Amino acid sequence: MKVNAKICFYKFKPLQAWRYILIRLLTNSKHTHAHLEFNTEPPIAVIVIDGKPAQIISGALLSKLKVEKYYEYDIGDLDLSANDFNYFLNYRKVSAAKIIFYYTLGRFFGMKKAANCVTFICDYLKFKGWDVPDLFSPKELWESLHADNNDRWKSPSRQNNTSQMDK
């Protein structure tokens, strides 16, 4: 089924705890978490958090977790099927320790990027046939979405989906 999809940036401080502070310091950025949301009935979000496979949760549960959405980027309509849900459930687990090690030392020694919320978004869109860059930090994603030449964030049908602030 075709559903509208968005990349959403959230303040995940209540869930990230000490990882929130370290990621902010190591990336010199206020952006620490992003995930995909789909306008299904009811709306769902696919999030990746420390030590767990990707989780599919309802939008209502996000509000109960006391996390705050501060920006969304509409990426248009995507076909959502059983293959997508299998992809979500089989995506590699995120490890905060690996992410922090990568930020502090690993990137200087050619370490493979650890899985995180942004690599999940990029990998999923590549799975859907998009030509998107390999990004790692929420700051890189934010800058790429807001670049003057953000043509890479067009769907395979080449629609340019513009960003908008969450009301």
Q: Which residue stretches match the model-derived regions?
A:
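Intrinsic-disorder/low-complexity regions
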Residues: 3, 38, 49, 73-78, ...
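Glycine-rich catalytic cores of cysteine/serine-nucleophile enzymes that process amide/ester linkages
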Residues: 3-76, 104-112
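Acidic/proline-rich low-complexity IDRs
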Residues: 43, 77-79, 140, 144
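Amphipathic alpha-helical interface surfaces
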Residues: 57-61, 81-84, 117
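A structural motif
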Residues: 76-101
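Activation targets extended, charge/polar-rich intrinsically disordered C-terminal tails
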Residues: 94, 99-167
